[in-house]
């Protein structure tokens, strides 16, 4: 059964990091890569059991710090829907062999409601797909998971 690490790049996200971490129940590890926050982002993340690494000046594949090969990349402004959470629990029950990546839909908050955006690559095997600046390279061949990521913009 595959294990899953959530990778979240942060900077001064103390007010919203809790929401995304609470939605990541299918993940076995939370890895926060912090970019010099001056607020309580690191303290809040650690309260949720997250491991914290620092972004630093050099380019680096921060996925190397993860304990697992499968990485779910999310933003602090996002959260999993219940449908995506259920899909990830189901996903963890299956071995994925040569799979490289999986895609998810995005629903973005606007002043007029929620907009559906095209699916993006967010769940990747770090040994097969590169992750730069906290997000994976787009892989249109990845299978689409049920559910969406909610992106909170307001």
Predicted segments, located by residue:
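A short acidic, amphipathic alpha-helical/loop segment
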Residues: 19-23, 44, 61, 86-87
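A conserved acidic beta->alpha catalytic loop
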Residues: 23, 34-46
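N-proximal low-complexity "stem/linker" segments adjacent to membrane-targeting elements
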Residues: 1-23
């Amino acid at each position: 059964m595959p294990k899953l690490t959530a990778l979240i790049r942060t900077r001064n996200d103390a007010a919203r990091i809790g929401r995304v971490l609470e939605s990541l129940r299918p993940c076995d590890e939370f890895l926060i890569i912090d970019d010099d926050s001056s607020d309580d982002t690191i303290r809040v993340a650690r309260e949720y059991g997250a491991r914290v690494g620092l972004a630093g000046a050099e380019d680096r594949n921060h996925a190397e710090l993860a304990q697992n090969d499968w990485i779910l990349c999310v933003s602090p402004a996002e959260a999993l829907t219940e449908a995506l959470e259920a899909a990830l629990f189901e996903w963890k029950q299956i071995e994925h062999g040569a799979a490289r990546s999986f895609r998810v839909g995005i629903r973005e908050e606007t002043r007029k409601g929620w907009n559906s955006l095209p699916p993006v690559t967010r769940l990747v095997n770090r040994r097969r797909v590169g992750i730069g600046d906290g997000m994976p390279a787009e892989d249109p061949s990845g299978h689409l998971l049920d559910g969406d990521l909610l992106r909170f913009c307001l």
